[in-house]
Amino acid sequence: MTDSPRPVSRRTFLHRSTGAGAALLAGGVLAGGTAAAAPPARRLAPAGIAPADLDPLALLKKMLAFDTQNHGEGGVTRPHAEMLKAVWDSAGVSSEIIPTPKKDNVHLIARIEGTTSAAPLLLLGHSDVVPVERAKWSVDPFGGVVRDGEIYGRGALDMKGANAAFVAGLLRHLNEGGRFDRDIIVLTDCDEEAGPHGSRWLAEHHWDKIDAGMVLTEGGWFLAQKDRTTPMLITVTRQDKVYFNLDIVADGTATHSSKPNPDSAIARLSRAVTAIDTWLAPVTLTPVTREYFSALAEATEDAPFKRALELMLAARSQPARERAAALVVKRSSYPWLHRALLRTTHAFVIEDAGYKENVIPSTATLRLNCRGVPGGQRPRDFLAGIRERLEGRDVTVKLVGNAGESEEDALKRLDETFSRPPSSIDSPLYTAIGDAAAKTYPGAVFAPALFEAGTSLYPWTSKGIPGYGVYPYVLDNDQLIGMHGNDERIAVAALKQGTDFMYRLFDRFRVR
């Protein structure tokens, strides 16, 4: 294409001796200003694709209409898969629904045939979503309501919005008669949010259908300047935080509720929670997170925030690093995100205590969901720190492992995940992402990053296949923290611009 900048290289993004830095892209805003022009329509040989399926907003509304809530053991994803299969059928793309042992919980695999035997590109997007608290939503969470320029719905951000951008971007190429230099596999998986039949199960039973040379899924955030609209930092994640759970268990005497006892399990658990409520694990900066925060310092127009980032990156002692990191979080427009990227986190997620109002229970349990920084603090060291913090409080801290797994075996498994290197930035997909960012978000900085959450990438990355993540829409902080929350939403303009981004990304693999 004539608007293509010079090819992106490793040197472009890692231009400092420490590996810190990012590519600066020239001029433009998302809203309230001039955005990059949309790619020209090139209609070569239109396929039988419905016009609505080329529109990411219309496609997202169709996806949101399906209730694919996953309460822990998988959801009902077949109707959603059948809808999407019809979309692929209309485009002349072969697709297959893969049932799992759970009724109506399925995967969908579509394969666009390429012109060579090059290793396929796989797009990975889950169809299941977390449950909703309907009473706390201001709109129908499955209604696809558009209000004040934002589309609301469970999965609008995570990750049906991304799926809509992925699919609509590909369909635009197919509608133009485009072909690609390799197969492109689109896997719409289930059980990403929880359940036994996710991507690992699929890899065990159908690896031949999803074997690929590189994978793109959810992950990297597209952040805005302090004005909440101007694109600031476009990131692609190349590594996930390490996921593990701890249970804090308190025991006491069970008795009739008319006789409150001094060794109440619930009271003991509450005191333990207080002891770690505001406690933070140590700040750890790895090459991946240093690269990210260096790019953020380059990208921001907020001078006090920039200074805080520079202080943190330059800190020579742990106390100085902790003080500067606290300032970074305080001055950030995305404080929860940046606090999560700095350290191992622990979140209070499930409390289990009591079963009848006239019985004081003998046991109370709190689950902590923890996310460790790979290459930072090891999960076993975090566990030791929590136990030390709660020593003498009459509670037990247990690492939650797999069925039949000892604590040491679970820690060894986590050590292996913790030590796995990030995906390489020397790949055609990484280059394509950077090139698309340069064309779509001029004026923003592009950089690799760590994903503070988790993905379905394990079956590929465990085999050394590079996997990356993006949420292809610019978000403000309110939208970002709506992920898994109430009134989840994204901006319609951001979704459409993100689809342009995906179109340009796929253009790198198009045959001329």
What are these language model-derived features?
Residues 61-69, 89, 93, 171-175, ...:
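Sec-exported extracytoplasmic/periplasmic mature domains
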Residues 55-60, 80, 84, 162, ...:
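Stable alpha-helical elements in mature extracytoplasmic
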Residues 69-71, 103, 116, 127-131, ...:
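Solvent-exposed loop/turn segments at secondary-structure junctions
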Residues 38-42, 51, 221-497, 503, ...:
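Metal-dependent amide/peptide-bond hydrolase catalytic core
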Residues 1-12, 22-28, 34-36:
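N-terminal secretory signal peptides
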Residues 40-134, 363, 367, 379-383, ...:
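N-terminal helical capping/dimerization or prosegment-like subdomains
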Residues 118-188, 194:
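Active-site metal-coordination/substrate-binding segment of hydrolases
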Residues 188-214, 218-235, 241:
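Hydrophobic, small-residue-rich alpha-helical packing segments that form membrane-like cores
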